[in-house]
Amino acid sequence: MGNNLMQTDLSVWGMYQHADIVVKCVMIGLILASVVTWAIFFSKSVEFFNQKRRLKREQQLLAEARSLNQANDIAADFGSKSLSLHLLNEAQNELELSEGSDDNEGIKERTSFRLERRVAAVGRQMGRGNGYLATIGAISPFVGLFGTVWGIMNSFIGIAQTQTTNLAVVAPGIAEALLATAIGLVAAIPAVVIYNVFARQIGGFKAMLGDVAAQVLLLQSRDLDLEASAAAHPVRVTQKLRAG
């Protein structure tokens, strides 16, 4: 019995070669899912790193602006893909659409709404790929378990056909079946961990972008208040002259 076990190839590749076609398909599917997981990890990691570094630099530059026009001048060098520039454009577009309106509070509310929608849209865009990670992390263990159950069923069928409980006959089939579960866990565990890491990073990035949006809204609010004060100042001067 020991010689038969030694002659049986129990390496990972050997178990795969001797596995049933259904178990092979399960293993291949899980390996492809693992490849997708790591591809998403590397691509999104680079994207997060670049976007966060760029947004942090833009936020520092915009902190020096004292008006919306000055912020637009600073953002002119950010490039067309700049998220900060998009937020500034939202505020500027609302000012242009609301030209002639004396309701400054309404302008601020509409601008705030547009900025919130823009931040939410960026968050959804940054979260692309996380759905695949969640799906892989959730179903991979069960897919691997299906392969294990199928492989053990075939092992029992082999025992019935050979009418022997010799370990040399039973062990390879069971080992092949358990390999499917192992591959399922290898695919699922990194997917769940990476999903949670990205979820935290997306939340942090949205918070940083929200700070930029608040900075843009602050500049617009200051401009509107200063314009309103400048328009009201001549009236107060005229009233004083008449009283005198």
Predicted segments, located by residue:
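Membrane-interface helix-boundary signature
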Residues: W13-V26, G127-L133
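Hydrophobic alpha-helical transmembrane segments of polytopic membrane proteins
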Residues: A177-A191
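Transmembrane alpha-helix/interfacial motif
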Residues: A19-A71
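Short, strongly hydrophobic alpha-helical membrane anchors
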Residues: M1-A19, N166
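Predominantly long cytosolic amphipathic alpha-helical stalk/bundle segments
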Residues: G2, R53-N166, V193-G244
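Transmembrane alpha-helical segments in integral membrane proteins
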Residues: V36-K44, A187-N196
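Residue-level signature of catalytic and energy-coupling elements of molecular machines
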Residues: D20, W38, A71, L88, ...
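Hydrophobic alpha-helical transmembrane segments and adjacent short intramembrane/lumenal linkers
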Residues: Q163-T164, V169-A177
